[in-house]
Every structure is written in C-alpha cells, then in structure tokens.
Amino acid sequence: MRMDKSEKRSNLADNFLYMLEFMVDDLLITRPNLCAPEEYPTCTEITFRSVFLNIRDRENGSCVNPCSPKCGKCTLFTLESPITDEDVMHIHVYKKRTESCKFLLGLTELPMKPIFDRVKKEFYSQNINWESNVESHLSRMPKLRGPCKKANDCVCYERNRERREQWCPTSELTKRMLPLFNLCKMQTGNIVLILRLVCNGPSVVSSFPVQRPVCKDPCNCCCPCPPTWPAPCSSPFDPCDPCKTVPAKKT
C-alpha cells in the first residue's frame, strides 16, 4: 500500500510536544451548592486526555486573599492519536477537602480541535519544510556502517538545509468565559479561563550550566594553579599546594 505525502506528514507530527498553560482569572457562582461547606477550598479540575490539573484558590486552613497573585499551572504532553471533533476539555469546579470529600459547584466543556488546528497550522508556516529537512539530515548523515557516498557533497553547509536543534515554537493565547452547569442542566455560574497552547515540535532543547566540583581535600587539590603567579599579596602558602609553605626571603 502506497503512503501519500499527507499521511506521511501526520505520522511525523504525531510526535509533537505540546504545552498547556492554565489560569483561572475569575469565578462567579450564582447558584451555590448548599451542601458544600464554605470553608473548603474551591478547586478547578481540568481534564484533557492524559492531562489532569488541579488549581486551588487557597491552601487548607487559609483565607482567600484578593491581593495575592493568581496561581496558574502548565503541563507538557504528547498526543497518542490525532485530535478529533470529539476531543473536549472537561472543567469541573468543586468545593474540595480531599479527593474523597468534594462537592460539585459546576462543570463545563471546551472544544479543543480548533485551537490545536490553528497552532499546528502556524507551526508549519513558521517552520517551512521541516519534515524534509529532518529526513534529508538523517539520510545524508555520515554513519559508521553502510555507504557514506551521500555525505560527500557538503550539503550540510547550505543554510536552507540546516537542521536546527529545536524548531520555532508557536502558541495561541485565549481567554474564555464559560458557563457552569450542575447535573440538572441548570446554570450555576461562570468561569473565566486563560489558556495558552504551545506547539514545540518533535523535541525541546535547553542548556544548563554545570558547576565544577570543589575539592574537599585542600592538600590534594585537583584544581590548576591560578594564572597569576606570584600572588598580588605576599602569602606564606603556595596557592598550588596549600600544605606547602613558601620560604620567606631574607632582606
């Protein structure tokens, strides 16, 4: 069976890494759950496929401070299958003490396919021919085994065929006010959710500093001598060997 170009592209794009950022900007409950204790924290649970987040308005035993900064969360995930019209984000608002003791205040859904389609389309427009770039790099890369004839044409020096460590990520920031409903289909309030979806491509690359280890034994120092010798200030110790004293000159 012959695979066309569109199917081949979708298979490569299945390995994309996505990041979702959430923040509850505002929450208004007009029809409260009378069974829910007011002192319990208000928790917003967000579920989308394998993603699950729990955003609380405060910690247990503390009061809500309107002047405190709002708390948001982010998650990094992949898609095990392409997005369809049936993929929705489930949002539940609870008065929750523990996982086994929580009271539903309202729930709602948010379709996710339009957001994913726009972010993915922008990724392809920002990273033109990234798939052929990866395939060309893998096929022309010098290898220890097998013929390396394709690696002799210096194609790696052409900028249009440069393979990057990480492709240009694309994102979309949206702010939605969604109605909340109870299990009787009655509206109980509204929630304002700020959501940001980031498409990172097939990989994420970042650098990090590594500090050189400090020798524990000063008499067996593994660090090299300082570049300036003799030292600016006269010292009775040898900087390369702290256990050895430097004989003082007689004047």
UniProtKB/Swiss-Prot annotation:
The keyword Transit peptide is annotated on this UniProt entry: no
Changes seen on gene knockout: No loss of viability or obvious developmental defects. Reduced levels of apoptotic cell receptor crq/croquemort in macrophages during embryogenesis stages 11 to 14. No effect on macrophage development or distribution, but reduced ability to engulf and clear apoptotic cells during embryogenesis.
GO annotation terms (biological process): apoptotic process; positive regulation of apoptotic cell clearance; positive regulation of DNA-templated transcription
Function of the molecule: Transcriptional cofactor involved in efferocytosis. Together with srp mediates expression of the phagocytic receptor crq/croquemort in response to apoptotic cells, and is up-regulated by crq/croquemort in a positive feedback mechanism. Involved in macrophage engulfment and clearance of apoptotic cells during embryogenesis.
Subunit structure comment from the entry: Interacts with srp (via GATA-type Zn-finger domain); this interaction enhances srp binding to the promoter of crq/croquemort.
Sorted UniProt keywords: Apoptosis, Nucleus, Transcription, Transcription regulation
GO molecular function, one term: transcription coactivator activity
Keyword Amino-acid biosynthesis applies: no
A GO cellular component annotation in the UniProt record: nucleus
Name of this protein: Transcriptional cofactor Bfc
Cell compartments where the protein resides: Nucleus
Stated induction or repression of this protein's expression: Up-regulated in response to detection of apoptotic cells.
